From Swiss-Prot:
<comment type="function">
    <text>Probable ion channel inhibitor.</text>
</comment>
<feature type="disulfide bond">
    <location>
        <begin position="75"/>
        <end position="90"/>
    </location>
</feature>
<keyword id="KW-0872">Ion channel impairing toxin</keyword>
<keyword id="KW-0960">Knottin</keyword>
<dbReference type="InterPro" id="IPR012627">
    <property type="entry name" value="Toxin_22"/>
</dbReference>
<dbReference type="GO" id="GO:0005576">
    <property type="term" value="C:extracellular region"/>
</dbReference>
<keyword id="KW-0800">Toxin</keyword>
<keyword id="KW-1015">Disulfide bond</keyword>
<dbReference type="GO" id="GO:0090729">
    <property type="term" value="F:toxin activity"/>
</dbReference>
<feature type="region of interest" description="Disordered">
    <location>
        <begin position="61"/>
        <end position="82"/>
    </location>
</feature>
<keyword id="KW-0964">Secreted</keyword>
<keyword id="KW-0732">Signal</keyword>
<protein>
    <recommendedName>
        <fullName>U11-theraphotoxin-Hhn1f</fullName>
    </recommendedName>
</protein>
<feature type="disulfide bond">
    <location>
        <begin position="89"/>
        <end position="110"/>
    </location>
</feature>
<feature type="disulfide bond">
    <location>
        <begin position="82"/>
        <end position="95"/>
    </location>
</feature>
<dbReference type="Pfam" id="PF08092">
    <property type="entry name" value="Toxin_22"/>
</dbReference>
<comment type="similarity">
    <text>Belongs to the neurotoxin 14 (magi-1) family. 01 (HNTX-16) subfamily.</text>
</comment>
Amino acid sequence: MNTVRVTFLLVFVLAVSLGQADKDENRMEMQEKTEQGKSYLDFAENLLLQKLEELEAKLLEEDSKESRNSRQKRCIGEGVPCDENDPRCCSGLVCLKPTLHGIWYKSYYCYRK
């Protein structure tokens, strides 16, 4: 009976001491993995950022191209005052200073080309 207790106590002490060593070893492994994970996450983040920038560039390029089927929006018609620096005349019109009529308004108007 006494030997059983001693054996049990010895096994218990060995299990606890080896468990602590494993715990410290596991902690070190976890630190290494988190450091590797951070570098992997940084790499993945940079890759995702590059893909998003490429996608954004494609979308902006598509927006800048005019479709034949799309109509022109928010343009100024013929004979309507326009801003010299930011003309928004419809296609086929140009923002020019008036010739005879409208001189007294001191403004630019949309005229046909």
